[in-house]
Regions:
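Basic, helix-initiating cap at the start of DNA-binding domains
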Residues: 1-32, 37-48, 62
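Hydrophobic packing within well-folded, soluble alpha/beta domains
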Residues: 21, 25, 42, 53, ...
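Short hydrophobic/aromatic patch on the recognition helix
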Residues: 47-57
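Amphipathic C-terminal alpha-helical segment
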Residues: 103, 150, 170-187, 200-202
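Amphipathic alpha-helical segments used for helix-helix packing
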Residues: 92-93, 107-128
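Amphipathic alpha-helical packing segments from all-alpha helical-bundle domains
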Residues: 76, 91, 127-153, 165
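Hydrophobic alpha-helical connector segments
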Residues: 66, 80-111, 163-170
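Amphipathic alpha-helical segments enriched in hydrophobic/aromatic and basic residues
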Residues: 29, 38-39, 50, 60, ...
Length: 202
């Protein structure tokens, strides 16, 4: 189990923000990948001494898992906020897909998705990482399925397909955009594909 701030031993107070340190580590791993990130890379990015690093995190793998969990939690929360931002379920789903297009184009697109990059680098072969990535996609599918079902109940979305099947298709398309962004796909192309998806599915 990962340690939390409340589980820390009593003693000298920590002189850095644990959550901010994990977020800095996430940026380092995101840019370099797990295997190409060295301890000096992490210490520089997190602005920690070696002693503080080992006391707080134990090892490189531990901080990587915490960074990946932070990333997946952020991603789910951001999608949830977009899906709740419009009273129309159909419009909310399109807004979420447009957000994926924004993240998948330009410099953000070339940088890629930390979750997708991690899956490509580390899987198969690491059950802990597989579980985090699998739970990310499941949580995203749950959010989209609930929004689709709401749209079906309101008559905005066709009832001819199961909401979870549609949600799986949406998430697959969204992650595909993240991959295409790595090779420089244009935002206008992605928006045309989103319009086609909306026309076919809804």
């Amino acid at each position: 189990m990962m340690a939390t701030n409340s589980q820390l031993p009593v003693g000298r107070p920590r002189e850095f923000d644990l959550d901010e340190a994990i977020r800095c580590a996430m940026q380092v791993f995101w840019d370099r990948g797990y295997h190409d990130t060295s301890l000096p890379d992490l210490l520089a990015g997190m602005k920690l001494s070696k002693g503080s690093f080992y006391k707080a995190f134990g090892d490189k793998r531990s901080v990587f898992l915490r960074a990946l969990k932070l990333y997946t939690d952020d991603g789910v929360r951001n999608v949830q906020e977009v899906l709740r931002s419009d009273p129309s379920p159909r419009a909310a789903i399109r807004n979420a897909l447009v957000r994926y297009a924004d993240l998948s184009s330009g410099s953000k697109g070339v940088r890629g998705c930390f979750g997708v990059l991690t899956a490509a680098e580390m899987l198969p072969g690491d059950p802990d990482i597989a579980d985090l990535i699998k739970r990310l996609f499941t949580r995203l599918q749950d959010l989209f399925a609930a929004t689709v079902a709401k749209g079906q109940a309101a008559g905005e979305i066709k009832n001819s397909r199961d909401a979870r099947v549609i949600a799986h298709f949406i998430v697959s398309h969204a992650q595909g955009m993240r991959v295409l962004g790595k090779v420089g796909s244009r935002r206008d192309e992605m928006l045309k594909n989103i319009d086609l998806l909306m026309e076919i599915v809804f």
